[in-house]
């Protein structure tokens, strides 16, 4: 069954909106961040990583956001240009706002943490006047990042993009992408997440992120099935609830559910997999694949990313993911990731 109908006549496939940052990942891994002294610079931020992931998979991708007017901002735009991502809707900050900086800790393959500098940053200064309806009208889907809702004026810009997408029958994908930075309190999180979640067509988030979104809706913590039903009843066609190393489940508007497990892989780090998962899953949907095949592709891409040093730079191609799945199935069996 085709749950999402993408307008194939449109120029762009997907346009993420929101956070773009600079990641500094330690070269000297397997030690605390306080002891790391050498880092490698990468493009970062979930929406930006998803954009790169989809571009690597051969899709026509744009990006709506704001970057600093300095060398880091130039790095982002040049990186996107080199990946074939349209940068016509990337604006430069005018009041000295900086790009967010992220320093990662890879203490062990299973112990990773992230230190973000998110004050006075450019991406949260995107304003409503910088959202172009014609651009949204010419893309099959937009990805709204939850971090774009954390603070004004980015909050209103993201919600305007959502409203324009609905008006122009552009598919809305809500990637919850919770980061504690910049939010004032949990009530604020619940309010704005719910606004986006009630108007989207696809929601992707972890169990913990859905708990934050539902804080003001219910006093009790819901089961995955109860959560999925709630957001499907609001009009979503697909709700994906992730449980990290336990796998994830996609719930669909016809009452069905599809489970996928992680592929066995030797971990290097425990972050970055979610963006690769989202990119490859959305690629499958754009290709018209079944939900389970799209989930499998996403799980494979995620496994490849957590075994590599970066998030953006190591996003795989379609051929690489297919080869990975083939090798995994030859070693572990055809049902290696399928629950």
Curated annotation (Swiss-Prot):
One GO molecular-function entry: ATP binding
Enzyme superclass (EC): transferase
Enzyme Commission number, as recorded: 2.7.1.92
Entry coiled-coil feature ranges: none
Pfam families registered for this protein in UniProt: PfkB (PF00294)
SUPFAM superfamilies: Ribokinase-like (SSF53613)
Keyword Lipoprotein recorded: no
Pathway(s): Polyol metabolism; myo-inositol degradation into acetyl-CoA; acetyl-CoA from myo-inositol: step 5/7
InterPro entries reported in the protein's UniProt record: Carboh/pur_kinase_PfkB_CS, DKG_kinase_firmi, Myo_inos_IolC, Myo_inos_IolC-like_sf, PfkB_Carbo_kinase, PfkB_dom, Ribokinase-like
Biological processes per GO annotation: inositol catabolic process
Keywords: ATP-binding, Kinase, Nucleotide-binding, Transferase
Catalytic activity: 5-dehydro-2-deoxy-D-gluconate + ATP = 6-phospho-5-dehydro-2-deoxy-D-gluconate + ADP + H(+)
Similarity remark: Belongs to the carbohydrate kinase PfkB family.
HAMAP family listed in its UniProt record: IolC
Described purpose of this protein according to its UniProt entry: Catalyzes the phosphorylation of 5-dehydro-2-deoxy-D-gluconate (2-deoxy-5-keto-D-gluconate or DKG) to 6-phospho-5-dehydro-2-deoxy-D-gluconate (DKGP).
Protein name, entry field: 5-dehydro-2-deoxygluconokinase
Species this chain originates from: Clostridium beijerinckii (strain ATCC 51743 / NCIMB 8052) (Clostridium acetobutylicum)
Taxonomic lineage: Bacteria, Bacillati, Bacillota, Clostridia, Eubacteriales
């Amino acid at each position: 069954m085709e749950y999402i109908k993408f307008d194939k006549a449109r120029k762009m496939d997907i346009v993420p909106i929101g956070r773009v940052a600079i990641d500094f990942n330690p070269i000297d891994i397997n030690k605390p961040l306080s002891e790391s002294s050498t880092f490698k610079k990468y493009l970062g931020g979930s929406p930006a990583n998803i954009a790169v992931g989809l571009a690597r998979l051969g899709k026509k991708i744009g990006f709506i956001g704001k970057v600093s007017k300095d060398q880091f901002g130039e790095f982002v735009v040049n990186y996107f240009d080199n990946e074939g991502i349209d940068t016509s809707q990337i604006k430069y900050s005018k009041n000295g706002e900086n790009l967010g900086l992220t320093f990662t800790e890879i203490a062990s393959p299973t112990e990773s943490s992230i230190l973000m500098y998110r004050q006075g940053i450019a991406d949260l200064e995107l304003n409503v006047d910088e959202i172009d309806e014609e651009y949204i009208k010419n893309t099959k889907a937009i990805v709204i990042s939850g971090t774009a809702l954390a603070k004004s004026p980015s909050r209103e810009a993201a919600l305007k993009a959502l409203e324009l997408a609905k008006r122009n029958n552009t598919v809305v994908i809500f990637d919850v992408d919770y980061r504690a930075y910049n939010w004032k309190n949990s009530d604020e999180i619940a309010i704005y997440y719910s606004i986006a979640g009630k108007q989207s067509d696809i929601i992707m988030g972890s169990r913990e992120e859905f708990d934050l979104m539902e804080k003001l809706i219910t006093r009790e913590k819901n089961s995955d099935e109860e959560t999925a039903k709630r957001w499907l009843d609001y009009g979503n066609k697909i709700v994906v609830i992730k449980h990290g190393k336990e796998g994830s489940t996609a719930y669909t508007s016809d009452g069905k559910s599809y489970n996928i497990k992680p592929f066995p892989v030797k971990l290097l780090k425990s972050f970055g997999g979610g963006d690769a998962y989202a990119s490859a899953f959305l690629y499958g949907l754009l290709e018209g694949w079944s939900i389970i095949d799209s989930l499998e592709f996403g799980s494979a891409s995620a496994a490849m990313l957590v075994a590599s040093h970066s998030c953006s730079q190591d996003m795989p191609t379609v051929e690489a993911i297919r080869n990975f799945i083939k090798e995994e199935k030859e070693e572990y069996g055809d049902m290696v990731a399928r629950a």
